[in-house]
């Protein structure tokens, strides 16, 4: 009976620990160039991210830049500030990474499949965007944990 209770407690602990690990991606992140901050949150079991801050030097005529590179003409007038650029990431416990997501690059107007991971510290988030299903054909970037202010 003691062994059963111990295993039950251990199982519950590991389940809680893995759930906390999956949420470690949430928070505010500087992009690699330190021109934008992205907030990553959990939404319906998946992780999404939107641009919540842009350095003023990126503003055009005092306004945040528009999504002019978007291939959909109807979306080219929307602001990049507030734009969701990351969606659909789900945590893979075995691989210890977030997978099956998409990342939008407002500089090019292209959307890529992506996955994300930590390499030791949870202060640096690594993301790799790649062309449909070909993970080796892509580009990695590094985001740094920060705060909104």
Predicted regions and their residues:
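Central antiparallel beta-sheet cores of small beta-barrel/beta-sandwich binding domains
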Residues: 41-113
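Short, compact, well-ordered microdomains
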Residues: 123-126, 140
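Edge beta-strand at a domain terminus
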Residues: 131-149
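Bacterial Sec-dependent N-terminal signal peptides
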Residues: 1-21
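Short, surface-exposed coil-to-beta transition loops
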Residues: 34-37, 84, 109-114, 136-140
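A mature extracytoplasmic/lumenal domain signature
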Residues: 42-44, 51-53, 118, 129-131, ...
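Short beta-strand segments that buttress and anchor functional surface loops
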Residues: 29-31, 99-106, 127-130
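Tryptophan-anchored aromatic micro-motifs
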Residues: 22-36, 51, 100, 143-145
């Amino acid at each position: 009976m003691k062994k059963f209770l111990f295993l039950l407690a251990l199982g519950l602990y590991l389940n809680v620990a893995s759930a906390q690990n999956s949420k470690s991606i949430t928070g505010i992140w500087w992009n690699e160039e330190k021109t934008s901050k992205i907030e990553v949150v959990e939404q319906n079991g998946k992780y999404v991210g939107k641009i919540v801050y842009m350095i003023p030097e990126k503003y055009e005529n005092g306004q945040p830049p528009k999504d002019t590179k978007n291939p959909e003409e109807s979306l080219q007038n929307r602001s990049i500030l507030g734009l969701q650029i990351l969606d659909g990431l789900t945590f893979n416990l075995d691989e210890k990474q977030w997978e099956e997501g998409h990342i939008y690059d407002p500089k090019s107007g292209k959307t890529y499949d992506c996955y994300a991971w930590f390499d030791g510290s949870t202060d640096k988030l690594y993301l790799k965007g790649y062309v449909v299903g070909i993970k080796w054909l892509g580009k990695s970037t590094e985001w740094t944990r920060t705060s909104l202010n």
